């Protein structure tokens, strides 16, 4: 039937399989792993069939350093693709660094970055003391919607204005001079 049962297999070289590999235990790789597919199906699935209310499935990015230090980057998720010149690009990146590794006072910063005009740029930065949008000072607008108002809060990145309400009902210049309009 083509089935072979082995208790221990030690392979020094490559294994090429054209079928399904069933592993009922843990998989440990010391040199990394690459999972690829030639179609648009899910490349990796983490499935939990547990019926309780606890979290799961879990994806853990674990930086197990023997000498952790302040400002260590502990994990990065890159969303990569190709441009029209067949070059690999990072379209978006999420990364975390630990600002303070002191026991009991640990702090971390989360960055969310996207590609903007050929450069990966900061969109959201969450530090231990603040949340910053557009930390790289790009000409980007920021908008908050309500159920009935498209521009309930609008920050005009190119003109350095903050608007509250629809359009320009209330405008304040962020350079120090405040312009107020009631509409």
Q: Where are the regions that the model predicts?
A:
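Intrinsic low-complexity, repeat-rich intrinsically disordered segments enriched
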Residues: 1-72, 80, 85, 98-100, ...
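Amphipathic hydrophobic-ligand
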Residues: 86-93
């Amino acid at each position: 039937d083509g089935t072979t049962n082995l208790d221990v297999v030690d392979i020094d070289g490559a294994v090429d399989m054209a079928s399904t590999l069933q592993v009922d235990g843990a998989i440990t790789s010391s040199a990394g792993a690459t999972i690829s597919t030639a179609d648009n199906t899910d490349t990796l699935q983490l499935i939990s069939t547990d019926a309780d209310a606890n979290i799961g499935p879990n994806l853990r990015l674990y930086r197990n350093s023997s000498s952790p230090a302040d400002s260590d980057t502990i994990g990065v998720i890159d969303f990569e693709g190709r441009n029209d010149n067949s070059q690999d690009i990072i379209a978006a990146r999420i990364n975390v660094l630990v600002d303070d590794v002191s026991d009991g006072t640990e702090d971390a910063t989360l960055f969310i970055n996207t590609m903007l005009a050929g450069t990966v740029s900061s969109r959201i930065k969450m530090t231990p003391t603040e949340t910053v949008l557009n930390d790289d000072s790009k000409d980007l607008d920021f908008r908050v919607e309500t159920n009935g108002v498209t521009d309930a809060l609008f920050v005009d990145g190119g003109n350095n204005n903050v608007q509250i309400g629809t359009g320009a009902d209330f405008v304040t210049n962020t350079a120090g001079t405040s312009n107020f309009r009631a509409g």
